[in-house]
A protein has these predicted regions:
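Membrane transport/envelope proteins' first extracytoplasmic loop
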Residues: 1-358, 497-510, 523, 592-601, ...
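N-terminal Sec/SRP start-transfer signal
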Residues: 1-42, 461-483, 525-573, 814-817, ...
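Interfacial "coupling" helices/loops that link adjacent transmembrane helices in transporter permeases
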Residues: 20, 360-399, 461-464, 803-845
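Alpha-helical transmembrane segments
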Residues: 352-359, 423-443, 508-522
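Short helix-loop junctions at transmembrane helix boundaries
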Residues: 406-430, 491-508, 853-893, 904-917
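Hydrophobic alpha-helical transmembrane segments of polytopic membrane proteins
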Residues: 431-450, 520, 886-907
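Juxtamembrane segments of multi-pass membrane proteins
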Residues: 483, 488-671, 677, 681
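C-terminal transmembrane helical bundles of large multi-pass transporters
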Residues: 740-742, 766-865, 869-879, 887-905, ...
Length: 924
């Protein structure tokens, strides 16, 4: 049996492919540019998002500060032989226990934390002879870390070990036969101080400080040296700042000052023997190694932290002892993960949209290329070339172009996003597959149809049966697309873009905008004949040829499905990206209003005196006192958990109206007398319960019946709220209520609050400035990356829309040219030719703009909650879509500009055609 001959299939194919590419170099360059740009976005987008996520999680942990540290408290007896007995190896045992703790941590957590920082601190001790003014407290402390630079002794020497007075006391009693009285001398503890502490307390080398308070017996601290830290900024000192300098806190009874006395490895045993079990704490602090933390690792780290916090028995040290673990790291990482999922949802929509539009544009370019070569390809087939050989030669042309485009896109992506982040190849490969196969498949289909010998039956009935079968197949495909789009939209609404069984984003759900655009395209194509027929009839009633010809050309235009779909998807995503960017920006501002509720929020020990002083300051418009009581049960056991917010209704109404544009005036009249009790507003989610069972809360044993007069969208935390006037509620209960919140509004509120706090000497206050919180949110690396991706995507999709329209104009130019040439022989001038071109293409552009704008608005409106925007903005309530004209202006402007440029360019090309040539040659 003879082997099949391959040479006729491939002979001369590389040379022919190269010559064809050179002949159509302009269109080939367009395909190359499309592949390169799309590959760049498909490769750089995920890398940039991952790098931004890494920066975001590091930023979140850094801003959390000590809240993100893992604290493990050792048992009081850790490292001791017996309570009250001095152990000279205490420091070694504690250091060993700290290192053992890090070794038994779960793998991911251990890889993410730094070397442990060990801190031994006494409780506050009193000075036996305190200074005359203020309140003073001393703390004996020792800190250790393998990465610490330590201290430098500038005067005196490092503290050393002191005699064990209890051992001496026991020996002296034994020597005296237990009969003679023996005096127990004070336990000597050698310490070091900084120059700042020495100056404040008037200490020098050799000074003795009598210690009083939580000590076992009498004890005296002896200063042996003055030190300074080699690096005062290192985190070893973060848990004990009083060791470096006195920590002063203002109080009405005078300054409350805490100062520290530094122990050494030798003197810590003396301090431990002088202190009771309840008089000290030994804490191991594990700070996060921020550069080692990545977004991919954050989830596993959070799981490890939650596991050891809930079950610290996993951390068993030598001797079977466990530690009490406390940290807020899991909460910090959980908050970040929530935001990351929201950003990922938006980015997935954009990436799928870009790949879809790019793929459609490549199909358009391939169709144009095949159409231009139709005569050559059909002639090649007529001379005996097989369909496979035709496809092979086209494949030899598309593969190098695609590979070059991929390489260019990859190089640009690596230059734009340098770093070790892995490359995600999936989206780029999808585009590459389309770029490689589009031209060969379309070319093979063309030559296969050209010489199949299949024709429509001459019999009318048989011909109608064949055409009917084709129409049924087409309608089935169209219905399938529409049903798929509706199903995807329904699934996103029901499950959410990220609430899937998979670990990430469901690509089918992420393709919802593209599927909806496909469904809209089908509906538009179905409506096209009706609309254009009506336009044609109107044009026929008017004088002139332009309107009739343009309407007829638009109605007879074939193959508009792909251009219309590409334009619709591109413009829809331009609108969607613009509206999403605006919604995120406004949503962050709304989130700051929800979280702060005023220009400045003061929490803690607020008083009427402070509120009055704030109102007297310049730049303050209003101020309202109140209190927030969380985790109350509405209507007793089994009721909803709510936050009870008591505030000065009239004053807070002025505050809220000044900062919240959405405030609806619901607080008006809240300070009046209710029918059954204090008037209250409730969150909308509580109305179903209050309408049936009423509303009541309990203050201790006293039941307070509430009169629900309306609902409110104001939020004061994650729980539903019950808002009442402070005065009327206080009058209805016998339980005394202390204000703990002050809301302030006004352009100068931040500075005014600071001045008022100093004036009244208020203490124990937490001040939150809304502008600062908003600035912090907007500086988030993750959200900023999303905003940049939205902007870049809008511009790129606008460019794709313009390219799609230009390709459509070029593809329809030959047929239109023949029509215009014939009309020129009948007297059509150049202006009329331009109007015919404009009229023919305008319905396509108008339909794409309208459908794209509709889909671009409908997706965020219908799917707002499912898209996870609330996770990005940080809003406590539902995110509301913000509609701005800029995205619509960009979509319309790009489409109109591309259309006008294409029409003018085509007219300029046809200006070179001479009427004599048209009359002589005829059909062009």
């Amino acid at each position: 049996m003879r082997a099949p001959r391959v040479l006729p299939l491939v002979a001369g194919s590389p040379l022919l492919a190269r010559r064809r590419a050179i002949a159509d170099r302009g269109l080939v360059a367009v395909c190359l540019a499309l592949v390169a740009v799309t590959a760049f976005l498909a490769l750089a987008g995920p890398r940039y998002l991952v790098e931004s996520a890494d920066r975001g999680v590091r930023q979140a942990v850094t801003e959390a500060g000590s809240r993100g540290d893992v604290l493990a408290e050792m048992p009081p007896a850790m490292g001791t032989v017996r309570e009250g007995v001095r152990d000279p190896r205490l420091a070694d045992k504690l250091e060993s226990a700290a290192n053992d703790l890090r070794a038994v941590l779960p793998d991911e957590l251990r890889a993410t934390v730094q070397e442990p920082v060990l801190s031994f601190q006494s409780t506050d001790l009193s000075l036996a002879a305190p200074p005359e003014t203020g309140l003073w407290a001393l703390r004996l402390g020792w800190v250790w870390s393998e990465r610490s630079a330590g201290v430098r002794w500038v005067e005196g020497a490092e503290p050393g070990a002191s005699p064990d007075v209890r051992a001496e006391y026991a020996a002296e009693r034994e020597a005296a036969g237990y009969d003679a009285p023996v005096e127990l001398r004070p336990q000597r503890v050698e310490v070091g101080v900084t120059r700042a502490t020495a100056d404040v307390l008037g200490l020098s080398v050799g000074s003795e400080i009598g210690l009083a308070g939580a000590v076992r017996d009498e004890a005296v601290a002896v200063v042996t040296g003055i030190f300074q830290p080699v690096d005062a900024a290192e985190d070893t000192w973060a848990g004990a700042p009083e060791l470096l300098e006195p920590v002063v806190r203002q109080a009405k009874r005078g300054d409350h000052t805490t100062t520290g006395l530094l122990l050494s490895r030798e003197s810590i045993a003396d301090a431990r023997s002088a202190l009771p079990a309840s008089g000290h704490r030994t804490i191991v602090r594990l700070a996060v190694d921020v550069p080692a933390l990545t977004a991919a690792r954050a989830g596993a780290v959070a799981d490890d932290v939650a596991s050891i916090t809930a079950n610290p028995e996993q951390l068993v040290l030598s001797g079977g002892r466990t530690l009490a673990v406390s940290t807020g790291l899991d909460e910090v990482l959980g908050e970040f993960a929530t935001r990351l999922r929201g950003v990922t949802a938006q980015a997935s929509l954009l990436l799928v949209g870009i790949v879809t539009v790019a793929g459609l544009a490549l199909v358009l370019a391939a169709r144009l290329l095949v159409t231009r070569r139709r005569t050559l390809l059909e002639a090649e087939r007529a001379r005996g070339a097989s369909v496979a050989s035709v496809a092979l030669r086209l494949l030899l042309e598309s593969v190098p172009v695609t590979l070059v485009g991929l390489v260019l896109g990859l190089v640009a992506a690596l230059l734009a996003t340098p770093g070790p982040t892995a490359v995600v190849w999936g989206p780029a490969i999808a585009v590459a597959v389309v770029a490689v196969l589009a031209t060969p498949v379309l070319g093979a289909a063309l030559v296969a149809r050209a010489w199949t010998g299949r024709q429509l039956p001459a019999n009318r009935q048989d011909r109608e049966r064949v055409l009917g079968r084709r129409r049924a197949q087409r309608r089935t495909a169209e219905v399938t697309v529409v049903v798929l789009a509706a199903g995807a939209a329904s699934a996103v609404r029901g499950r959410g873009l990220l609430q899937t069984q998979t670990s990430g984003v469901d690509l089918l759900l992420a393709a919802t905008p593209a599927l909806l655009a496909a469904g809209a395209t089908i509906l538009v194509l179905r409506a096209f004949p009706v609309v254009l027929g009506a336009i044609g009839r109107l044009a026929a009633r008017r004088r002139g040829l332009v309107g009739v010809v343009a309407a007829a050309r638009a109605a007879q235009a074939a193959g508009l499905g792909v251009p219309l779909l590409s334009l619709t998807v591109a413009l829809a995503l331009v609108v969607f990206a613009g509206l999403t960017a605006a919604t995120v920006g406004v949503g962050q501002e709304r989130a700051s209003i929800e979280q702060v509720g005023a220009d400045v929020l003061v929490e803690g020990g607020v008083t009427r005196e402070l509120a009055d002083e704030v109102l007297r300051q310049d730049g303050v418009d209003s101020a309202a006192l109140g209190t927030t009581i969380g985790t109350r049960r509405l209507n007793g056991d089994g009721g909803e958990v709510v936050t009870l917010v008591l505030l000065e209704a009239a004053a807070y109404e002025r505050v809220r109206a000044a900062v919240d544009p959405r405030y609806g005036g619901e607080l008006a009249g809240l300070d009046g007398a209710g029918t059954d009790g204090p008037r209250v507003l409730v969150s909308p989610s509580l109305r179903a319960e209050t309408d049936v069972a009423g509303a009541r809360v309990y203050d201790g044993e006293q039941r307070v019946v509430l009169d629900v007069v309306g609902d409110t969208t104001m939020t004061f935390g994650p729980e539903p709220v019950v808002v009442a006037d402070l005065g009327t509620y206080t009058a209805a209960t016998e339980v005394p209520l202390a204000e703990d919140t002050l809301w302030v509004s006004g352009p100068g509120a931040p500075a005014a609050v600071e001045r008022a706090i100093v004036e009244v000497e208020a203490v124990d206050l937490d001040v939150t400035v809304r502008a600062d919180r908003l600035a912090s949110e907007r500086s988030s690396a993750l959200v900023r990356a999303l905003q940049q991706l939205l902007l870049l995507t809008s511009l790129v999709l606008a460019m794709f829309a313009a390219v799609t329209l230009v390709l459509t104009v070029v593809a329809t130019a030959p047929e239109r040219g023949r029509t215009l040439s014939a009309l020129r022989t009948l007297g059509l001038d150049a202006r009329g030719a331009r109007l015919v071109t404009l009229g023919e293409l305008s319905p396509l552009v108008v339909a794409a703009v309208l459908a794209g704008a509709l889909i671009g608005v409908a997706v965020p409106v219908v799917l707002t909650s499912a898209l996870g925007l609330r996770r990005v903005t940080g809003e406590l309530g539902t995110t509301e879509l913000v509609v701005t004209p800029l995205p619509f202006a960009l979509a319309v402007g790009v489409a109109v500009l591309a259309l006008l440029v294409s029409v003018v360019a085509e007219a300029a090309v046809r200006r070179r055609d001479r009427l004599g040539d048209v009359l002589r040659v005829g059909d062009r």
